[in-house]
A protein has these predicted regions:
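Glycine-rich phosphate/nucleotide-binding loop
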Residues: 23-131
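Active-site rim beta-loop-alpha module in soluble metabolic enzymes
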Residues: 1-27
Length: 131
């Protein structure tokens, strides 16, 4: 959600109910129409969403903005989590940490994050069978 506690039933803002929930419903409908089997829930309070995802409820979380996602991702699995940018004409994945320019040329960087980002990009790019 956008507002604290996803709006707390309107007490802390109506955006989650009036703007975000209808968008999630449209996305859910489009996925079903495309034959994609996915659990699409929300809006969910950010502090709960990531705890539930790490616990296995979902395979991923779509966050409202960058820092809302990167902070819990780094706490849960720094180094091997992958950031995916949606809404672009290309598949874009990136490591969950910064550029690490201070490590350039020193052979001290761990490539696991880059490998995870490349693997996910390959998976997202793969053709999917249509129903």
């Amino acid at each position: 959600g956008l507002n604290p506690h996803a709006g707390e039933g309107g007490l802390l803002g109506r955006d989650d109910a009036t703007r975000i929930a209808p968008g999630i419903a449209r996305a859910r409908g489009r996925l079903r129409a495309a034959g994609v089997a996915a659990t699409v829930d929300g809006p969910v309070p950010a502090e709960s969403a990531f705890r539930l995802a790490v616990g296995g409820r979902w395979d991923g979380v779509v966050a409202m903005y960058h820092d809302q996602a990167t902070i819990p991702m780094k706490v849960a699995s720094f180094g091997d989590a992958v950031n995916v940018s949606l809404g672009l004409p290309i598949v874009r994945t990136s490591v969950d940490h910064g550029t690490a320019y201070d490590r350039a040329g020193r052979w001290t960087a761990d490539e696991a994050g880059m490998r995870a980002a490349l693997s996910l990009a390959r998976l997202l790019r793969a053709p999917r069978p249509r129903p």
